[in-house]
Amino acid sequence: MDNNIRQLIGANQVAEILGISSSYAYKIIEELNQELEKAGYLTIRGKVDSLYLERRYFPTPDKIYTVNN
């Protein structure tokens, strides 16, 4: 995933990025979209913002450090 490009991605891309099945990817997309809707954002069913997915599933090294210490 390119860190500088924001795009909406579907279940097949989410599945590939996370190494999961596409059916499980749909569940993850639904959960992430519910979080975004709760925060007041509009969402598209079956798509999720790539940067939001990255932020939720791939923490930065400084966040990993603070959790481990």
What are these model-derived regions, one by one?
Residues D2-Y24:
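Polyanion-binding surface elements
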Residues M1-D2, G40:
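Short hydrophobic "helix-edge" motifs at membrane interfaces and signal-peptide entry regions
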Residues I20-Y65:
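Major-groove DNA-recognition helix of helix-turn-helix-type DNA-binding domains
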